[in-house]
Amino acid sequence: MDLIGKNVVIYGAGISGVSAYELVRDKGGRAIIYDDDPTAERATNSVGVFQNADVIVLSPGVSLCKDFLFDAKLENKLVISELELASACTRATEIAITGTNGKTTTTRLIDAILKAAGKSSRALGNIGTAFSSIADKLDENDFAVIEASSFQLEGCLNFAPHIAVLLNVTPDHLERHGTMQKYMDAKAKIFAKQTEDDFLVYNADDDKIEGMIIGARSHKVPFSIVHPTNGGYISSGFVCFKGKPILPLDEVDFKGRELENVVAAVCVAMLLNVSPYIIAKAVADFKPDAYRRQLIGSIDGIAVFNDSKATNVYSCLSACEAMDGDFVLIMGGARREEDFDDFFRQVPITLKHVVVTGENQNDIMSCAFDRDFKSIESASSLKEALGLALAYARENKCKNLLFSPSSKSFDAYKNYIERGKTFDREVANCKNFERSK
C-alpha cells in the first residue's frame, strides 16, 4: 500500500490505533488519530479531520455503521481496518485464525509449533500484540500468526492470508453486527480474497461453515473431531492428518470440543511441512492461557476450574463437555442475545447442578426449567454462588466445580480477566483451599 503523502486518519487511540499511526508515519503518510473520547491522549475529537482524509483506518472497537464513515465511502475515501493496513505493509507469510471460540488457543498453538520447528513466528492481532506494530519489520522468512476477530475482519478489503483457519461460527457480537448473517459475512472475509495458491482450514463439523465456504477459491482442508476427513481428524486415540497419525490424545491437555483447536493447528503445521514429532512435542508441552478451564486448586477434595473466558453459550458447553466426572457449574453474567435453551438441550449428564448469578440469571433459569433441568438455583453474588456450589458438591460427592459464565462480563466487571481474578480471590479465601501446583 502506497501511503507516501497520503492523509490518513486513525480512528481509535488504543493499542492498535497508536500502532497503526506509527506504521503510517513510517510509510511516509501524514497520520492523525481521532477518538470519540475528548480525553484520549495523542488524539483529536474533531470530526473535521475526516474531511481531508484519503484513508481512514478503523481500530477493532469502531463499527463501520457510523454515518460519517458511510459518507466517507460515498466520497471514495478508503475505509479499512487496522488488520487490512498491517497486512498490506508486510512481507511475512500470514496465517490467520478466526471463529467464535478457540481463536486465542489455536493461534498460540500454531505459534508454539512453528517456534518448536525453528521458524521465526509471531502471534499477533486480537491476541494482544497489534499486527501493525511489527508488520513492516517482518520479511518473507517470518510467519505472522494472526488472531482475527470479526471486528477486525469486517473492515478488510484485500486481506488474503496464505493459510486461513475457520474454527466455528455460533451467535456472538450481534449487538455490533446486527444479524447472524452479517456476523458470518465478516468472518468470511478471512478467505474471500484467497487464491488457488492459498489454503482454507475449516471445521467440517459446523454446518454454517460448510455453507459459508462454497465459493472459496483456495484449497479447502477440512478437519473434524467426529469423523474422518481428507484433512485432519481423530481416530483410534490419535490426531491424524490425511491418514497419518500425528500425536496421541493421551499426551495432550485438551478434551471434547477443545480438540478442534488441536486438530486445526495440526492441519496448519502439516501444510507447512513441520515434522509430526515436533508437532506432538509442542502440543504436549503447551499450556493454555489463564481462565480457560484452568485448574486453580481444590477445596475439601473438590477440584475448582476457572473458565472465565467463556463469554458465550458454546464456549461454556465446550468446557462442560471436557470435564471428567460429575461437576457443579456456576454460570451467568451480562444479558445479551444468548440461547440458553440450546445449552440445556446439549449439556452432558455429568452436570449435576447449576448455580446462576449475574444480570441474566432469570433468563438462564427459565430456559433450564423449560428443558426440565430442575437442579438449579440462583445467587446474588459470585461469592454466594461459590458457597452454594461447594455446599452442593460436598453433599452430593461431586468432585469438580466449574466456573464458566457463558456470558459477557460487563454486568459487573471490566472484562473476563477481572472477573476471573475475582473468582480466584473468592476461591483462595475459602477454608481448606489448596492451590494447584
Where are the regions a protein language model picked out?
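Short internal beta-strands
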Residues: 32-35, 200-204, 330-331, 350-359
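Walker A (P-loop) phosphate-binding motif
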Residues: 82-125
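N-terminal leader/targeting and accessory segments in enzymes
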Residues: 1-81, 85, 430
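Residue-level signal for inorganic ion chemistry
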Residues: 24, 56, 97, 126, ...
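C-terminal helical cap/extension that packs against the catalytic core
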Residues: 341-399
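Flexible active-site lid/hinge loop adjacent to a nucleotide/diphosphate
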Residues: 138-222, 233-235, 246-254, 409-417
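Beta-strand->loop->alpha-helix junctions that form or flank phosphate-binding loops
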Residues: 35-38, 80-84, 218-234, 280-284, ...
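Nucleotide phosphate-binding/pyrophosphate-handling subdomain across enzymes
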Residues: 4-7, 19-23, 248-351
